């Protein structure tokens, strides 16, 4: 079937939780490690579309609203057999219509970036993925009277405040979902929360993120604490390309792998600071 016939035959519909297992298989076909559980979380937090040919799901695209003015896009996949037929553009146009009126953020694969540029996205940064088995566990250094304690659901209001100060986005549902799926740590200083890190199962092992802190030292402390007891386990972290955290992750046994360009269509969110997001929840969710 020619590209035009494939494009015309593709039927788009809203993605549903029941699609999670099928989407995980599609992700594996393009080398992505996402489990059905990872898809269930992503679908539950956002909206999106799938493209079908007959009964077969051949492409996906999702988006996640953060407040009234911004959203992130991700999980944009076209099966290898149907790439180049224009289905990716159809999907993107569908999610752009769903998210109309919002400024949009995404992390672009090399293959996807030309399409996103044609749709009005511009590069605004880069993210580097580190992953691997932990071989050396760094010791957390508690500076300036800091202390660490476990995070619970009762901490969500303050975690949301720190996260919004770091990202400029209200991401309460995301933080709740990540904490419910895993565990977290709060860095305390002077009786107040001064940073946090969340960790959950994802893909081939564990992912540490988001990590939010006021400075690099506190971020390193939270990251080191998250690696405690993880020797021999597969861990992933997504950080800004060129971040000093890369040296720490490499020393722990994680290796730098692919990088992606961060892109925006519209206006960037405006973090109020002084907090900063040092690792992502995922490249799709931000």
List the model feature ranges, each with a label.
Residues 1-6, 16-17, 21, 41, ...:
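Intrinsically disordered, low-complexity, positively biased terminal segments
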Residues 14, 28-44, 51, 56-86, ...:
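Basic, Lys/Arg-rich alpha-helical nucleic-acid-recognition elements, primarily the DNA-binding modules
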Residues 116-121, 249:
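Conserved active-site tyrosine of GNAT-family acetyltransferases
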Residues 124, 129-157, 162-163:
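Surface-exposed beta-loop interaction hotspot
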């Amino acid at each position: 079937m020619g590209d035009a016939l494939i494009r015309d035959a593709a039927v788009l519909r809203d993605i549903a939780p029941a699609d999670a297992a099928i989407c995980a298989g599609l992700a594996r076909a393009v080398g992505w490690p996402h489990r059905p559980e990872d898809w269930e979380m992503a679908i539950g937090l956002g909206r999106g579309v799938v493209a079908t040919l007959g009964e077969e799901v051949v492409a996906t695209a999702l988006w996640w609203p953060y407040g009234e003015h911004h959203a992130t896009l991700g999980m944009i996949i076209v099966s290898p057999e149907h790439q180049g037929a224009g289905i990716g553009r159809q999907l993107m146009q569908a999610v752009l219509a769903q998210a109309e009126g919002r400024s949009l953020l995404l992390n672009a694969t090399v293959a996807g970036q030309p399409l996103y540029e044609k749709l009005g996205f511009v590069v605004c940064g880069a993210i580097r993925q580190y992953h691997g088995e932990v071989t050396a566990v760094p010791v957390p250094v508690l500076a300036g009277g800091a202390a660490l304690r476990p995070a619970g659901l009762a901490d969500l209001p303050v975690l949301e405040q720190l996260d919004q100060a770091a990202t400029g986005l209200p991401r309460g549902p995301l933080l709740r979902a990540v904490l419910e799926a895993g565990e977290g740590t709060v860095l305390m200083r002077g009786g107040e929360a001064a940073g946090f890190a969340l960790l959950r199962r994802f893909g081939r092992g564990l992912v540490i993120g988001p990590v939010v802190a006021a400075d690099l030292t506190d971020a390193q402390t939270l990251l080191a604490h998250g690696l405690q007891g993880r020797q021999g386990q597969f861990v992933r972290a997504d950080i800004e390309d060129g971040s000093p955290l890369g040296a720490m992750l490499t020393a722990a046994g994680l290796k730098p792998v692919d990088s992606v360009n961060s892109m925006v269509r519209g206006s960037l969110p405006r973090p109020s600071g002084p907090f900063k997001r040092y690792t992502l929840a995922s490249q799709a969710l931000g």
